[in-house]
Amino acid sequence: MLAALNAPFPWTRRHVLSLEDFSAAEYALVLQTAGSFQQVLARRNRKVPTLQGRIIVNLFFESSTRTRTSFELAAKALSADVVNFSAATSSLTKGETIFDTTRTFLAMGMDIVVVRHRDSGVPHAVARDLEQLGSPVSVINAGDGQHEHPTQALLDLFTLCTLLDAYDPRPELLAGKKIVIVGDILHSRVARSNLCSLVTCGGEVHLAGPPTLLPGEFRQYGATLHHHLAPALEGADFVMTLRLQKERMGDYLLPSLREYHRLYGITRERLALCSPGVRLLHPGPVNRGVELSSDLLDDPRLSLVSQQVTSGVAVRMALLYLLAGGKAA
């Protein structure tokens, strides 16, 4: 496995900001590399010296449990040094700009910065600023507003492909598979990134949700839209439910959580419409009894949520490794 990691990689991307222009070959490379690191994480000693001496900064301006912790564990498993930034206790509270904060870490020798922000486009702006300074630092988008969440979509892709072939996860395994994404599509950066990856890999993507949370613009991504759940679920191989982002929506978009669950909540009865062997995904955090019932979430025969979390560490290890040059420091 370690010999495979030392092989030359056709990776030319400096940043991971969006999946809109990711190629099938790049998805294949990420999956292959993540598969190798998944083997590392299954060992008793879950650490390799690959990025020893490198500095990874987690620049999170928005609350996060899974994503920040996953990036931290990924960097530490690669033996990198990790700095976790807290906006609440930083000089931002004194009027410092995000760019000045980033430049401060640049002066301290960071190699990769992971940026999460409530506003769309911030990671891209940070990347442009670093490029204008002539810095070789790479930027990873860990979620920006309603725009994208590339690493979540990559770990979802890895979860699906390893389920279909644990020994050789590859994008073409999703060809012809019906994948349904249900919920607050309008505000979901996860949905946008997953649309990019799943369609590129040959998946048949269907979106379902209330008309107020599922605008027609999503057809341009190659998805089929449904405002009624039953037709969307018919013959589905995978169903991904999304959290209702009440903090981003006005009261006029949704009558009530109870009404939403009645019309769009995933229950065992509704799963009968899907293909035999259907599996469930959720990027988290989950509102139990709203997006899907608790018994489904806790059923290991149906739920892939724990596998998604596990996949996240391996996928983020792969991205850090590839951005660092695909070789040990």
UniProtKB/Swiss-Prot annotation:
An individual GO BP term: 'de novo' pyrimidine nucleobase biosynthetic process
UniProt binding sites for L-aspartate: K94, R189, R243
Entry binding sites for carbamoyl phosphate: R66, T67, R116, H149, Q152, G284, P285
Documented EC number(s): 2.1.3.2
Reactions listed under catalytic activity: carbamoyl phosphate + L-aspartate = N-carbamoyl-L-aspartate + phosphate + H(+)
Pathway terms, separated by semicolons: Pyrimidine metabolism; UMP biosynthesis via de novo pathway; (S)-dihydroorotate from bicarbonate: step 2/3
Cross-referenced Pfam families: OTCace, OTCace_N
Keywords, sorted A to Z: Pyrimidine biosynthesis, Transferase
Record text on subunit structure and interactions: Heterododecamer (2C3:3R2) of six catalytic PyrB chains organized as two trimers (C3), and six regulatory PyrI chains organized as three dimers (R2).
Function: Catalyzes the condensation of carbamoyl phosphate and aspartate to form carbamoyl aspartate and inorganic phosphate, the committed step in the de novo pyrimidine nucleotide biosynthesis pathway.
Family statement: Belongs to the aspartate/ornithine carbamoyltransferase superfamily. ATCase family.
Protein name, entry field: Aspartate carbamoyltransferase catalytic subunit
Lineage, highest ranks first: Bacteria, Bacillati, Cyanobacteriota, Cyanophyceae, Gloeobacterales
Encoding gene (name): pyrB
